[in-house]
């Protein structure tokens, strides 16, 4: 029987499956407890989503995504009224202001996702890409 891979996106850490931490043991930065704190302490311009990756009905991967809306930052473009600043502001607001990250934007390293060693990692990564 060919395994069926799927994903579920959770908007709150309180919605995460009970066995989430079984995979998060590799990094505290993906644990339910850490994600709950991250969710509560996130700045107003950032939203967190948590992705569960499933092989049939079994959780085989977990990931964190963050959406950052830089339009909400106060520090961009209020310095002066010259044409150069105006052009920069238009370009920034229309092309560079929405960022989707897989992982935590304040951490480096392997803290974006965890995949079970027992699963087909290529298929799980393809499923994460679809999410």
In which residue ranges do the predicted regions lie?
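N-acyltransferase acceptor-side catalytic subdomain
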Residues: 1-131
């Amino acid at each position: 029987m060919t395994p069926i891979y799927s994903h579920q996106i959770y908007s709150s850490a309180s919605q995460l499956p009970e066995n989430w931490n079984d995979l998060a043991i590799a990094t505290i930065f993906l644990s339910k407890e850490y994600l709950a704190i991250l969710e509560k302490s996130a700045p107003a311009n950032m939203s967190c989503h948590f992705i569960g990756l499933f092989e049939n009905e079994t959780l085989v991967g977990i990931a964190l995504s963050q959406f950052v809306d830089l339009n909400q930052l106060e520090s961009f473009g209020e310095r002066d009224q010259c044409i150069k600043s105006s052009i920069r502001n238009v370009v920034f607001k229309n092309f560079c202001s929405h960022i989707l990250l897989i992982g935590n934007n304040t951490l480096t390293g392997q803290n974006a996702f965890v995949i079970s060693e027992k699963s087909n990692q290529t298929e799980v990564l393809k499923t994460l890409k679809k999410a």
